[in-house]
Design a protein with these regions (language model features):
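Generic alpha-helical hydrophobic packing signal
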Residues: 19-23, 38-44
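Intrinsically disordered, low-complexity N-terminal regions enriched in serine/proline/glycine
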Residues: 7, 37-38, 58
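Helix N-cap motif at beta-to-alpha junctions
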Residues: 9-13, 42-50
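Short amphipathic alpha-helices in soluble, non-transmembrane regions
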Residues: 19-20, 51-60
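N-terminal acidic leader/helix
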Residues: 1-28
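A generic structural signal for beta-strand entry/edge sites
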Residues: 1-3, 36-40
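RNA-recognition motif
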Residues: 30-36
Length: 60
């Protein structure tokens, strides 16, 4: 599992979840509001954590 905090101004959480689930078949992602500016994104069942970290690095 990987959890990161991302700013809403950077990317919409639904868009990011769709991108992750398309790039990593079998992965599941969910987001939780922290406040009006940030959300927490958690990703499970991703087999390639290095590649996931590269994808998330664009938005963190």
């Amino acid at each position: 599992m990987k959890t990161v905090i991302i700013e809403y101004a950077v990317i919409d959480p639904v868009t990011l979840i769709n991108k992750i689930e398309k790039a990593f078949p079998g992965a599941m992602a969910i987001f939780t509001d922290i406040d009006e500016d940030y959300f927490e994104l958690s990703v499970w069942c991703c087999n390639d954590l290095e590649m996931l970290e590269d994808v998330l690095a664009e938005y963190v």
